[in-house]
Amino acid sequence: MQSARFFGKVAPMQFRVRWPSLIVCGFAFTGAALGERPAQADLDHIREELGVNSFTAPSIQLVFQELNALKPIPFDKAWRDLPDATPQDRARLALSTGAVIADGFLTVTAEKQSRIEPVGRVLMKLAKGLGVGEHVTKHSRSILEKAARQQWDEIRQELVRTQAEVEAALLGLKDEEIAHLVALGGWLRGLEMTTSIVADNYSPERARRLIQPELMEYFLDRVSTLNPNFKKTKLAATMDKNLKEIRRLTTKRADVPVELDEVKQVRSLVREINTLIAHGEE
């Protein structure tokens, strides 16, 4: 498999790649409001030491960069009810796991201590369903302990490590497709968050953060190579159709902003996908 470039040279009519949300997946946070951030090299090292490298999806922790840049965050506009059921198929399990990690990043960025435990509980259930529960348990306990002491920067590191260890465990099981879906789930949930935040307080500059051509192409490519049986589902068909429409809406010249109505359309499209991930096709 060829390594994907996420922050390299882009076409003249495209912006530099940004994590929209809220990836992901595969998920660098800036500004004094979030405290002193670790160097990107340190974050990369965390993933490298666990065997998660450029052959896998980008780290979901990049959602912090976008959430921080869009502060103050209208938490109630970006939050959602956590899924209460565990999906029976591994594709939805992986997508849901990534989405809940992104929910955790939102909770930590907004410093909502009361929401930490519910996120950890749901994440544990999903990770067990994927067969990687033991890789999440120690981090969940540490996150709860650090939340009680309001050690938000350290909690962020635990969340980064959680995704990296889940990816590494899945790769160890030769489950690369599922590892990519964890990242995709985080990216989709992150995109829903950021479109909600931008729509609540719109400006052309804030809306530019939704333009991420290389990540969009990367995940569309991932969707096109999914298991044939999964591609027959309503979720996969909706994901493919809606992501292509999101790409159309956000493909702009550098001097043309994403309009407010387009931001709302993107939010609606990605929310439809996330609803199917969380609740299935019933």
Tell where the protein language model's regions lie, with residue ranges.
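Bacterial N-terminal signal peptides
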Residues: 21-31
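A cross-kingdom marker for long, charged
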Residues: 228-282
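Short, charged, amphipathic alpha-helical segments
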Residues: 117-121, 141-142, 181-184, 206-213, ...
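N-terminal Sec/ER secretory leader and immediately downstream segment
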Residues: 37-143
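Extended amphipathic alpha-helical interaction segments
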Residues: 148-232
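Bacterial N-terminal signal peptides that target proteins for export
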Residues: 8-23
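Secondary-structure edge/capping motif, primarily at the C-terminal ends of alpha-helices
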Residues: 104-111, 130, 134, 169-173, ...
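Long, amphipathic, charge-rich alpha-helical segments that form helical bundles/coiled-coils
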Residues: 86-103, 123-130, 134, 183, ...
